[in-house]
C-alpha cells in the first residue's frame, strides 16, 4: 500500500489537471514497476502537495474582477487594453496580444512539456545494465526519485495553470481564443516554450522568496539607500516619480514603494514575466504559493532534497500602489517625456538591441535635474546594433548631457580612479544550494540630467 500511495496521489492530481484543460486524465509517463516503499514523511509531504494542487485557497486570494486599485491603475489598464486589441497595429508575432497568447499557451502546457522530458529521463535510465540498475535501486531508489519528480511537476503545473487563468481574467482572454491559438500552433508543429515558464518559477525565487534574499541583498541596499539620499534633498511631503524598466517580476519596484515618498512605475516587455507578475501581484497574503522550481534539471545538486525542495512565496505582500506599464521601454512611455525624477536600471541596459536608444529614452523621460541610477553587467545579447565598453559608455553618456555623481562606497569600489563608477559583485543564479555560481562584476553609477 505504501509503495503505491505516491502513484495514487499523482494520479489524482493528474486527473484534476486533465479535467481542467480537457486533456486525457492519464499521465503521459508510464508508471515504473516495483516502486520502493515511501517513508512516512515523504507520504505526508506528497499529500500536502496534492492538497495544494486542488485547493484554490492555498494559492492566494484573487481580487474580484481584477478591478484597478487607483485612478493611475485605471488609466493604464484602459490604455493597455487598447494596445492589446487585435485591431491595434499589425497582427504579427510582436503584437502584445499574440505574445500574451504564446505565454498563456506555455503556462497551460507546463505539465505536458515537462512530463515529456521526464519520459526521456525514464527511457534513458533503461539503458543502464540490470546489474547497475539493481545497485541504483537498492542504494538510492532512482525510480522513486523520478516518481517524486513527477508529483512535483504536477504541483508546478497546477500553479502555472492558475497563473494562466488569472491572466485570462485580467486581460479578458476567452478560453476559445486561447484554444484556437494553441490548436493552430500545434498543428504547425510548434511546441510551447518550456524554458520561459521554468525561468518564471526561478525568478519567483529571486524576487519573492526568502531563498532569493542573498541575491537581492547584493544589489537592492545600494539602490534603496541611494534613493533615500536623493529623497532627503526634497521636502518631506514631496513624492518623487520613479521608473524601473526591465522590471521582471517587480520586487525591486515594490521595495522602493515600501520606502515611502515615491510613486513607482515599473515596465516590462516579456509577456512571460508579465503573466507571472500579475499572478504574484494578485496575492493578498504571504506564503500563499508553494512550488518546486528546480525539478526541471538534474545538474548541480548536492543532494536529492536540493533538487526537490519546496519554495514558498511571496515572502512579503506586494505593495498596492506600484504600477506596471507593459511594452517596449523605448515607445510605450512616449507620453511621459520629462516626467520622472529618477530612473533605475537594474540588470537592464545590456538587454538593448540598440543601447543608444535606451540612453535616448532615459534622457527623454527624465526631468531636468533628474537622476539615472544603474546597477548591472554589460553582457550583450545576440545581434546588438552597438556594443560599448564601460569607458565608452561613460564618454557617450557625458556627451549626451549627463553628469556623473558619486553613488557612495556601499555600492562597491571605484572601477576607475578618478571616475565616479563603482563595481560590485552580484550573483545571478536563483538557487543558493546549487553547486555552481554565476556572478557579475556589476557596474554601478548615478548621473544627473543637466
Walk through the language-model features, giving the residues of each.
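Core SAM-dependent methyltransferase catalytic element
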Residues: 400-401, 416-450
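Conserved Class I S-adenosyl-L-methionine
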Residues: 291-296, 379, 383-415, 422
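A short glycine-rich, Lys/Arg-flanked "PGG" loop and its adjoining helix->strand segment in the class I
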Residues: 356-369
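A short acidic, Gly/Pro-enriched loop at the edge of an enzyme's catalytic core
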Residues: 330-343, 437-439
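S-adenosyl-L-methionine
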Residues: 281-336
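Conserved beta-strand signature within the Rossmann-like core of class I S-adenosyl-L-methionine
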Residues: 369-381
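N-terminal accessory segments
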Residues: 2-236, 240
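Conserved class I S-adenosyl-L-methionine
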Residues: 235-248, 255, 263-268
Amino acid at each position: 500500500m505504501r509503495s503505491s500511495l505516491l502513484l495514487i496521489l499523482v494520479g489524482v492530481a493528474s486527473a484534476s489537471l486533465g479535467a481542467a484543460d480537457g486533456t486525457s486524465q492519464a499521465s503521459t509517463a508510464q508508471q515504473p514497476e516495483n516502486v520502493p516503499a515511501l517513508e512516512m514523511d515523504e507520504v505526508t509531504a506528497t499529500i500536502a502537495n496534492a492538497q495544494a494542487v486542488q485547493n484554490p485557497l492555498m494559492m492566494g486570494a484573487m481580487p474580484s474582477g481584477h478591478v484597478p486599485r487607483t485612478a493611475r491603475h485605471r488609466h493604464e489598464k484602459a490604455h493597455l487594453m487598447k494596445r492589446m486589441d487585435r485591431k491595434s497595429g499589425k497582427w504579427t508575432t510582436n503584437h502584445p496580444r499574440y505574445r500574451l497568447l504564446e505565454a498563456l499557451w506555455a503556462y497551460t502546457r507546463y505539465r505536458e512539456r515537462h512530463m515529456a522530458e521526464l519520459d526521456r529521463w525514464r527511457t534513458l535510465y533503461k539503458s543502464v545494465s540490470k546489474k547497475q540498475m539493481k545497485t541504483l535501486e537498492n542504494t538510492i531508489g532512482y525510480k522513486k526519485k523520478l516518481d517524486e519528480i513527477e508529483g512535483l511537476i504536477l504541483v508546478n503545473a497546477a500553479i502555472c495553470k492558475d497563473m494562466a487563468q488569472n491572466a485570462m481574467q485580467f486581460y479578458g482572454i476567452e478560453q476559445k481564443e486561447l484554444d484556437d491559438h494553441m490548436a493552430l500552433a500545434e498543428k504547425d508543429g510548434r511546441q510551447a516554450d518550456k524554458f520561459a515558464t521554468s525561468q518564471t518559477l526561478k525568478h519567483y525565487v529571486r524576487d519573492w522568496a526568502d531563498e532569493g534574499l542573498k541575491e537581492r541583498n547584493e544589489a537592492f541596499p545600494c539602490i534603496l539607500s541611494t534613493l533615500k539620499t536623493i529623497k532627503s534633498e526634497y521636502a518631506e511631503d514631496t513624492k518623487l516619480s520613479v521608473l524601473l524598466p526591465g522590471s521582471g517580476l517587480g520586487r525591486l519596484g515594490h521595495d522602493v514603494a515600501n520606502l515611502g515618498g515615491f510613486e513607482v512605475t515599473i515596465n516590462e516587455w516579456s509577456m512571460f514575466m508579465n503573466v507571472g507578475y500579475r499572478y504574484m501581484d494578485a496575492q493578498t497574503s504571504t506564503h500563499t504559493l508553494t512550488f518546486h522550481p528546480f525539478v526541471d534539471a538534474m545538474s548541480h545538486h548536492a543532494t536529492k532534497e536540493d533538487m526537490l525542495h519546496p519554495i514558498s512565496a511571496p515572502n512579503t505582500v506586494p505593495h498596492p500602489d506600484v504600477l506596471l506599464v507593459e511594452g517596449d521601454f523605448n515607445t510605450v512611455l512616449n507620453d511621459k517625456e520629462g516626467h520622472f525624477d529618477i530612473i533605475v536600471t537594474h540588470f537592464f541596459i545590456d538587454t538593448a538591441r540598440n543601447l543608444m536608444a535606451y540612453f535616448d529614452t532615459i534622457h527623454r523621460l527624465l526631468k531636468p535635474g533628474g537622476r539615472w541610477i544603474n546597477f548591472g553587467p554589460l553582457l550583450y545579447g545576440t545581434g546588438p546594433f552597438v556594443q560599448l565598453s564601460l569607458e565608452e559608455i561613460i564618454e557617450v553618456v557625458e556627451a549626451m548631457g549627463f553628469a556623473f555623481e558619486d553613488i557612495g562606497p556601499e555600492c562597491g569600489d571605484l572601477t576607475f580612479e578618478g571616475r565616479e563608477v563603482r563595481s560590485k559583485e552580484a550573483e545571478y543564479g536563483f538557487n543558493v544550494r546549487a553547486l555552481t555560481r554565476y556572478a557579475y562584476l556589476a557596474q554601478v553609477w548615478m548621473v544627473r540630467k543637466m
